[in-house]
């Protein structure tokens, strides 16, 4: 199961994080494939990984961490997909093979989203909406066709 929360962050915190992510100050790292069945490109910016802060902009994700009330962070990264001419659903996957939580905070509106395998449900991209679920839940990214970019913040935590 998953839980969806609208207006997750206070507007000032959400706007500060979004302003950073759409600015020229963010370092996006290029990935030539989102999965093995396509050559669809994507980008990410890692804030936290392997028990260390990996971004000078970590301060922007602190309100997210506080609101989630997790005990420990595994990884926090922003993912950027560029507009596609047609909708594409990536392969289903799980984030980690052990018990933990995943939260996806949508930074932009659009017709993309996250597809869950069981139950067969889609959560659409809506600004400041978050979906929280067990990291072993099979899910898939869905690309957008109606917006120049889809940005999500992916948080894995205990």
Residue ranges and their predicted role:
Residues 1-72:
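Non-heme Fe(II)/2-oxoglutarate
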Residues 48-158:
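Catalytic core of non-heme Fe(II) oxygenases with the double-stranded beta-helix
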